[in-house]
Amino acid sequence: MLQLKLFAVLLTCLLLLGQVNSSPVPEVSSAKRSRRMTPFWRGVSLRPIGASCRDDSECITRLCRKRRCSLSVAQE
């Protein structure tokens, strides 16, 4: 009976040791930050004409001039 208990304890220790060794390794985060919005949400969230912008991709007309969404390429 003592041998059976000793075998059970040894087997349990081996199983627990295997679980510790197979635990996942944390991933290293990349230095470059990726865009968070999917293409669907980028399309839905485009800014109207006259809204403030930083980039052509933010405007519904794809024209950001003088930090405002523009309708035409050349403004007076």
From Swiss-Prot:
Family membership: Belongs to the LEAP2 family.
A cellular component annotation (GO) from this entry: extracellular region
Short name of one Pfam family: LEAP-2
Membrane-spanning intervals of the chain: none
Role according to the record: Has an antimicrobial activity.
Keyword Disulfide bond assigned: yes
Keywords noted in UniProt: Antibiotic, Antimicrobial, Cleavage on pair of basic residues, Disulfide bond, Secreted, Signal
Organism the protein comes from: Mus musculus (Mouse)
Location within or outside the cell: Secreted
Protein's name according to its UniProt entry: Liver-expressed antimicrobial peptide 2
GO biological process: defense response to bacterium
Domain of life: Eukaryota
Record's signal peptide: 1-22
Propeptide part(s) removed at maturation, as residue ranges: 23-36
Disulfide feature: C53-C64, C59-C69
Principal cellular location given in the protein's record: secreted
